Amino acid sequence: MSLGLNSAWAEGNETDSSVRTIKSPRFARPLVEKWIEEYAKTEPGVTFQLVKGSGNQDDIDLLVTFDNQDNGNTKDFSHIVFFGETAVLPITARSSEAARLLEGKHLNAKKLKQLFFLDDEFEEDTKKNKAFETIIIYSGSNASSVATSFAHNFGEESSSFRGKRIAGDDLYLNTAIAKDPLGVTFNALSNVFDLQSRHLKSGLSLVGLDLKKDLANSFSDEGTLDDVLTILENGKPAEVTIEKVGITCSNSADAAVSRFLQWVLENGTKYNHEYGLLNLH
C-alpha cells in the first residue's frame, strides 16, 4: 500500500525538533508503543512519543482515531489512514449481581438495545425484561470513547444510553462495574482481554450473546482473544460492534511523519492481532 503522498507535509522541510508526538485512546496505546519501538530501529534519529492525558492539541503530530469518533476537536488533522478494526463487547464484573441476572441469557441485537438504551422506540416483538431495569449501565462520555460506535451499531446515539456516563478513558468503565454489583458496560477487546495471557482480564465476565453454538464458547468467559479475533474476521454478528481504526496527521506535519505513516501501513499492521485489533478486509 502507498499513501500516495503529494501534499505539503510530505514535500516540506523537516522540523528542527527530533521528537514527534502521537495521541491515542488507551485501547490502542500498547500497539502504538510497539510501533514506536520497532520504528526506532529503522530511523533512530527521529523519536516518536505517546502523549498521555489531554495534552496540548497544537503539540500533537499524529492522532489515533476511529471511523465513528466525534472529530469536532480534530479540525487541524487530515489524511486519515485506516490500519485495523476494533471490536466492542458487553461486559460485567464476574460473580456480580448483574452477572447473576444475565446468567443463561443469550442476548440478540434487539435485547442488547433494550438493555443499554432508553426504551422509547423498541420493536413491539421485544418483550420488556424486568431484570434489565435493575441493571445500571455505564458508558463513556469522552470523545475518544467507543460509546458512539457502540450506539451507532444499534441505530442509537450516545445520548440515548441508560444509566451513568463516565468521564475519562474507557478503561475507567472496568473500574466502575467492579465497584457496582449491578453495573454493566462495554469495552474494546484490548480493554477486555489481557494481552499477555489472551484470556479475560481478572474480574471481568462477558455478557452472553445470541450466537451459533459453535461460536458461543469463544464468546464465553472461557474464550480467548485469539478465538474472538478469528471469528470476527470471518463474520461480523449484528450483536458485536466493529469499528475501523486509523491514524491521522496534523496539517503541519512534516516528511518524518509521512515516513512513519508509510511504515505503519507496510509493517505496523502485522502487530494488530497481538494487541487486540482485527485486520482490515
Task: Give the residues covered by each predicted segment.
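A short, hydrophobic beta-strand-centered structural micro-motif
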Residues: 64-66, 184
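Glycine-rich nucleotide phosphate-binding loop and flanking beta-alpha elements
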Residues: 70-72, 192-193
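Exported/periplasmic ABC-transporter solute-binding proteins
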Residues: 4, 8-44, 53-57, 79-81, ...
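N-terminal post-signal-peptidase region of extra-cytosolic proteins
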Residues: 65, 71-77
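N-terminal pre-domains immediately preceding structured catalytic cores
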Residues: 46-50, 63
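Extended substrate-binding grooves/exosites of carbohydrate-active enzymes
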Residues: 60
